[in-house]
């Protein structure tokens, strides 16, 4: 959404499959998305829910349909299976081949010879050695070769168009060789603006009547770069900004070191921070009481004019994570059910704080959390309002049934944004160019 929207392509992101009336309200939009929670769900959930979503997208009839995955490819056979999503999407969305483009140099995500790398702490790490992703609490990544990783989730031949082909003018021939070998899923390398644009050219020129692509927002970065080169889009314009606000509320279930650093910086910047005991979510009654307590604490600070952060953890080494895992293990419920309860509870908490304090801007931190929390807020659709950091724009809410008066929101993956990100949200400012070029993970 943000990549296309800020490039001049009117874009809307729905939180549920839109009907004809909803589409008509955004008739000016040239790009339409449907946000979901598949990344935190089982293959059985996908079987029950993704076909209807894919059928809706097929009826829209876009030349390229993109199944958006995390730029660090978070997935496993039992949860967030990208392979299962591909199996369900291909017969409905078609295409002679299916580009797999996860690299996004603007986010500090690079792919070389099929292996994904990501920035953390100012250095570039291979994915299986990444300080955050190798220790992800739900989908730890132990394989950097994306074709090898994906092969655990889907039995399908996979090809590669590598840097040598992309940089040497042989990308078309490399793609043809993959297709001749029966490799319909084709991974694309990219390390810089030139290779991401060449990947975009390959996708656009070989889209056929329609194309089902898989990848991060690198797919949109690639297409935008190519469209600018051929004159379909104007050159990059000065990014928009939003007016500052006096207070914001942040709810976070992220365990990422990046979010932990943001919480610590927010505290130094005068935000009041509160721990929320996620272990209580193993018992719905205890969780309701814990959310009530967090609401009282957060509301008191907001009424005193302070911004607040309510968080379930500060980094991957927070003892709260061990307590939460133990509570989940003892609960007798599927872990994904309790994780969904945590995300939905934090969403309701944000809505209640907004309703009682007059807040108009909020933040939800945590990739898995954001989907559940946004659904709990009853958000109908989002449009991009202002860039704050790559992958974490300020968005305008549309049709937010339970958002308590919130008009603007940021849905922030745990690894997105610089240390002062929450202060940036408060100001409504946008990231500096250097931040955009090397987004820390």
Region spans (language model):
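N-terminal basic/disordered segments at the start of proteins
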Residues: 1-27, 48-49, 103-106
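C-terminal structural cap/anchor segments
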Residues: 298-365
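Conserved, well-structured core segments that form the ligand-binding/active-site neighborhood
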Residues: 117-297, 304
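Short acidic, glycine/serine/threonine-rich loops at helix termini
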Residues: 2, 25, 77-81, 109-118, ...
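Short beta-strand segments
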Residues: 33-35, 68, 99-103, 187-191, ...
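A structural-propensity feature for long, helix-poor, extended segments
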Residues: 27-38, 306, 395-435
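Cap/lid and interdomain-hinge subdomains that line or gate substrate/regulatory clefts
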Residues: 30, 42-47, 52-69, 73-196, ...
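Conserved, well-ordered active-site substructure
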Residues: 359-417, 421
């Amino acid at each position: 959404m943000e990549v296309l929207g800020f490039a001049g392509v009117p874009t809307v992101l729905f939180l549920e499959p839109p009907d004809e009336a909803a589409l008509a309200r955004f008739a000016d939009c040239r790009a339409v998305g449907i946000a979901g929670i598949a990344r935190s769900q089982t293959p059985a959930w996908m079987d029950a829910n993704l076909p209807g979503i894919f059928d809706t997208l097929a009826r829209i009839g876009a030349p390229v349909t993109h199944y958006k995955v995390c730029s660090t490819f978070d997935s496993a056979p039992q949860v967030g299976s990208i392979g299962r999503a591909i199996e369900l999407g291909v017969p409905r969305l078609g295409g002679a081949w299916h580009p797999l483009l996860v690299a996004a140099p603007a986010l500090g995500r690079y792919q070389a010879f099929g292996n994904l790398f990501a920035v953390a702490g100012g250095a570039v790490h291979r994915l299986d050695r990444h300080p955050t992703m190798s220790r992800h609490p739900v989908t730890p990544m132990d394989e950097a070769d994306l074709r090898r990783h994906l092969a655990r989730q889907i039995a399908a031949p996979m090809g590669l168009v590598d840097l040598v082909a992309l940089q040497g003018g042989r990308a078309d021939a490399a793609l043809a060789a993959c297709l001749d070998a029966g490799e319909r899923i084709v991974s694309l390398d990219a390390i810089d603006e030139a290779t991401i644009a060449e990947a975009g050219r390959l996708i656009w020129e070989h889209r056929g009547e329609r194309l089902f692509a898989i990848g991060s927002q690198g797919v949109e970065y690639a297409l935008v770069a190519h469209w600018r080169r051929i004159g379909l889009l104007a050159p990059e314009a000065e990014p928009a900004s939003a007016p500052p606000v006096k207070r914001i509320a942040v709810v976070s279930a992220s365990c990422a070191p990046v979010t932990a650093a943001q919480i610590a910086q927010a505290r130094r910047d005068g935000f009041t921070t509160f721990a929320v005991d996620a272990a209580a979510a193993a018992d719905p009654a205890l969780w309701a009481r814990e959310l009530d307590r967090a609401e009282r604490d957060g509301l008191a600070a907001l009424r005193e004019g302070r911004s607040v952060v309510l968080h379930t953890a500060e980094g991957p080494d927070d003892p709260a994570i061990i307590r939460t895992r133990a509570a989940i293990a003892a609960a007798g419920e599927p872990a994904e059910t309790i994780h969904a309860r945590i995300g939905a509870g934090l969403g309701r908490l944000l809505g209640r704080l907004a309703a009682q304090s007059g807040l108009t801007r909020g933040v939800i931190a945590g990739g898995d959390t954001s989907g559940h929390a946004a659904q709990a807020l009853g958000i109908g659709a989002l449009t991009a309002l202002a860039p704050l950091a790559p992958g974490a724009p300020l968005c305008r809410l549309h049709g937010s049934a339970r958002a308590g008066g919130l008009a603007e929101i940021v849905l922030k993956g745990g690894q997105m944004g610089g240390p002062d990100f929450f202060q940036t949200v408060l100001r409504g400012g946008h990231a500096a160019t250097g931040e955009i070029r090397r987004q820390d993970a």
